[in-house]
Amino acid sequence: MAMVTADASAAADAATKQPDVEKDYSSYNGASTAGAGGGGVVESVVARWRREDMLDKCPLALHAAAAAFAFVALVLVASNQHGDWMQFDRYQEYMYLLAIAALAFAYSLAQALRHAHRMRGGADPIPAPSARLFDFIADQVVAYLLMSALSAAIPITNRMRTAVINNFTDATAAAISMAFLAFVALALSATVSGYKLSRQMYM
């Protein structure tokens, strides 16, 4: 009889301790879940910082690329003089392309220098509230002018190349390609500026 009573007491003690064990285990799982959630928040913040840093560096890289492409196009057109009909200044289309390439080069170089100065800690010459709006509008205007110059130069170049292919037409085609790449860089820069401007308006 004593043994039965002892067994019953042991079983009662075990039943009484069981919830404590489960409670401790549940607390452990909760702490682990909270820790995992905190890690996710940190990763999200770090990813956002990286995205912001990339968006901040994009204008510098894109304007530098546009300046380089526009400069090459400018040099190719300006040096494309081979005598007789193979003189770029005999064609209004190429004169227009030369002028717009020079404008795109000057604008893109100025913007690249401005963004480089700002990223080094210097003051932006354009006030912060209107800087993104200026970038967005100016990039679109210069990109449109480049596309206009390309639309004027491509047809006459195609007509020339159907008749003859020589150094003059090759240099002109190369200049058009470089001007198109400058257009792409400025179009991408305008897209980034538009995205940053939209975020500024809704913040």
From Swiss-Prot:
Membrane topology, record value: Multi-pass membrane protein
Assigned protein family: Belongs to the Casparian strip membrane proteins (CASP) family.
Disulphide bridges: none
Residues of this chain annotated as glycosylated in UniProt: 167
Extracellular side stretches: 79-92, 157-171
Organism per entry: Hordeum vulgare subsp. vulgare
Domain of life: Eukaryota
UniProt keyword terms in alphabetical order: Cell membrane, Glycoprotein, Membrane, Transmembrane, Transmembrane helix
Name this protein carries in UniProt: CASP-like protein 4B2
Bilayer-spanning residue ranges: 58-78, 93-113, 136-156, 172-192
Entry-linked PANTHER family: CASP-LIKE PROTEIN 4A4, CASP-LIKE PROTEIN 4B2
Keyword Transmembrane: yes
Description of how the protein assembles with itself and partners: Homodimer and heterodimers.
